[in-house]
């Protein structure tokens, strides 16, 4: 364990000047023609993203997050004319994502509510057209749940909630783009391999990949695996406290197939992560493995990785393969083919990486937890990387350019 206590890191030490014109408001026309910064053991160079496969070791395992962004912004107009925005955050009833999108007639979500002061009481109502039939959607506000509200939705007809949000929802693009969602975002703000609905923000490192780049990875002998972490709105939550001890990470829900964990074991517990969401999931698997080594009787909910868990010193450290094997044995004892759990892990300087050996990621906001994750990975060399990107005309944030980090 590193001697740094990340709780006392000052977020102001992770600031840098980011002019608005360097924030990519739209993606470039061809995803894989974005620029690629390569950081290799302290040396920095640049290339084009479609050449990524040639920088990766043959036979390596690359892990992608296959979550799909949902049209989470729903608008209702009150009889008074007031516009209320209901932003879906997390399923409440049913709480399972897959069941939620299949459900008909009624469901409940934890949501952020915009223009809340105008919604004192009563239900919101909106008529929409689905497959030629008129469907009336009602929304009723329930109890406060942290900073979000429970919203109960009800509607008529044999229509799933997935169809409801496809018809009336709007794709939530990042707030720092400072523009309205456009029709093109429905395509460009999804990865080409997105499958499992549930995120309210894209795992943007994956936006550069095309079918051609994926085929080229295969041709280079790179093995590919997928996992699912549903990205929450908290990914844009600024760090407002002076020290990061005062910042609470949001809980994110993860699903990992048994086969993927076996593949990680076959690769000596090492992986190339596509994006910070894949990093958080992979590194959380290590701590889940430590938990079941200590107590094999735990259930899935008890595998949740708390924010500061890696830094407490309570967990005996071990090789990543041993932790993954313990997790696999725990799954097999329960005949589980997919692990469903959650993580709140914060990765910051002072963190020792266990599974992720290379990282593909975009350029992140100043003073963000994602920048802390990158700094922990490149052992503080983030200044060198970001100075290079700023001086070589790289585009920043969600629709910006990419980097391959090899510490």
Per-range role (PLM):
Residues 1-407:
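Surface-exposed, charge/polar-rich loops and edge strands
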């Amino acid at each position: 364990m590193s001697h740094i206590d990340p709780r006392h890191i000052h977020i102001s030490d992770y600031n840098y000047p980011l002019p608005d014109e360097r924030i990519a408001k739209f993606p470039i026309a061809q995803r894989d023609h974005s620029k690629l910064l390569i950081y290799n053991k302290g040396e920095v160079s640049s290339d084009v993203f479609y050449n990524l496969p040639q920088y990766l070791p043959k036979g390596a395992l690359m892990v992608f997050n296959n979550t799909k962004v949902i049209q989470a912004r729903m608008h209702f107009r009150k009889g008074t004319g007031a516009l209320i925005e209901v932003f879906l955050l997390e399923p409440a009833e049913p709480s399972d994502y897959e069941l939620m999108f299949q459900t008909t007639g009624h469901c409940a979500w934890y949501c952020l509510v915009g223009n809340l002061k105008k919604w004192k009481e009563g239900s919101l109502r909106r008529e929409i057209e689905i497959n030629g039939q008129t469907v009336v959607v009602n929304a009723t506000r329930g109890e406060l749940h942290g900073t979000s509200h429970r919203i109960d939705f009800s509607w008529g007809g044999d229509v799933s909630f997935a169809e409801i949000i496809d018809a009336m929802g709007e794709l939530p693009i990042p707030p720092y783009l400072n523009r309205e969602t456009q029709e093109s975002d429905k395509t460009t703000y999804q990865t080409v391999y997105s499958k499992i609905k549930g995120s309210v923000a894209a795992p943007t490192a994956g936006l550069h990949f095309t079918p051609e780049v994926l085929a080229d990875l295969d041709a280079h002998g790179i093995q590919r695996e997928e996992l699912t972490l549903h990205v929450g709105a908290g990914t844009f939550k600024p760090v407002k406290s002076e020290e990061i001890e005062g910042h609470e990470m949001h809980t994110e829900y993860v699903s990992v197939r048994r086969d993927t964990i076996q593949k990680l074991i076959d690769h000596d517990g090492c992986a190339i992560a596509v994006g910070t969401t894949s990093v958080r999931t992979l590194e959380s698997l290590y701590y889940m493995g430590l938990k079941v080594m200590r107590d094999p009787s735990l259930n899935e909910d008890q595998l949740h990785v708390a924010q500061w868990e890696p830094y407490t010193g309570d967990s005996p450290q071990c090789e990543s393969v041993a932790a993954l094997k313990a997790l696999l044995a725990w799954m097999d004892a329960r005949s589980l083919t997919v692990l469903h759990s959650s993580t709140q892990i914060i990765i910051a300087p002072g963190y020792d990486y266990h599974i992720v050996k290379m990282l593909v990621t975009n350029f992140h906001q100043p003073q963000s937890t994602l920048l802390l994750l990158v700094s922990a990975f490149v052992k503080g060399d983030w200044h060198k990387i970001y100075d290079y990107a700023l001086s070589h005309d790289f585009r920043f944030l969600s629709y910006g350019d990419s980097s391959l980090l090899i510490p």
